[in-house]
Amino acid sequence: MSGVDQIVKTFADLAEDDREAAMRAFSRMMRRGTEPVRRIPAAKKKVNGFMGFRSYYSPLFSQLPQKERSPFMTILWQHDPFHNEWDFMCSVYSSIRTYLEQEKVTLQLWIHYAVGHLGVIIRDNYMASFGWNLVRFPNGTHDLERTALPLVQHNLQPMNGLCLLTKCLESGLPLANPHSVIAKLSDPSYDMIWFNKRPHRQQGHAVQTDESEVGVSAMFPRNHTVAAEVDGIINLPLSHWIQQGEFGTESGYSAQFETLLDSILENGHASSNDPYNMALAIDVPMMGFNGGA
């Protein structure tokens, strides 16, 4: 007797109540088998600084075809002095992207609120601020021409991902339920101070200088006592901050240093009457582009 015949015979020999119970069991099994398989969505690609830069500034060339627009965006990026800021901004976005997309916050909207807190030039002022002109030739092609070389200043800005999110929320970032995002960025692994200067290494979205003594020497006079205190704080391990609590609250630092640090943490820069050079100036390289036809 075949397997099918055996099943039919067994089913026929069942009492009526047992037969109905078996039918219900078979029906449930069939429904489970026909349900669509739930696919786990693939992890989305991390957004890097150039992707964010291109997304934000590309509308500057909206009147041009894509084949002309892309090379111009590459040229602007190569000579943009805010690579660290863009990497940081987009790395924070990547780490909370799932939460933001649930509330319809796109990359463009995130950047709109974030750029102002990192000193990045807004889109409408970008070309004029960096001396760029879009030139149109008689044959209809275009090129970029640079007519001015501005001096770009980077202020010392202690900041982490949670700080950037908080500033964006305060300036109007539309998140109906920000608590889950705040919890994500409150994890100790994200709680490193980010300094706006090169060279750097990137851990998650927190950027920390490799050679703190180089950065400190650019801000303070040689052998100044405050410089030694800042350098000591920069090199403290993450575990120290988790144990100690808020940044710079330990006892033993000079009143001069604590006053300076309070000004930086509250305002993003030193007070106007502070004698130290808190602006790290970087010259934008001189470059001309004229591929005339």
UniProtKB/Swiss-Prot annotation:
GO molecular function: DNA binding, bending
GO biological process per UniProt: positive regulation of mating-type specific transcription, DNA-templated
Pfam families named in the record: MATalpha_HMGbox
Keywords, comma-separated and alphabetical: DNA-binding, Nucleus, Transcription, Transcription regulation
Nucleus as UniProt keyword: yes
UniProt subcellular location: Nucleus
Residue ranges of the annotated DNA-binding region, renumbered to this chain: 42-97
Highest rank taxon of the organism: Eukaryota
Main location: nucleus
GO CC, any one term: nucleus
Function: Mating type proteins are sequence specific DNA-binding proteins that act as master switches in yeast differentiation by controlling gene expression in a cell type-specific fashion. Transcriptional activator that induces the transcription of A-specific genes like mating factor ccg-4. Required for mating as an A-cell and for blocking of heterokaryon formation (vegetative incompatibility).
Family in the record: Belongs to the MATALPHA1 family.
Protein name: Mating-type protein A-1
Organism field: Neurospora crassa (strain ATCC 24698 / 74-OR23-1A / CBS 708.71 / DSM 1257 / FGSC 987)
Lineage: Eukaryota, Fungi, Dikarya, Ascomycota, Pezizomycotina
Gene from which this protein is expressed: mtA-1
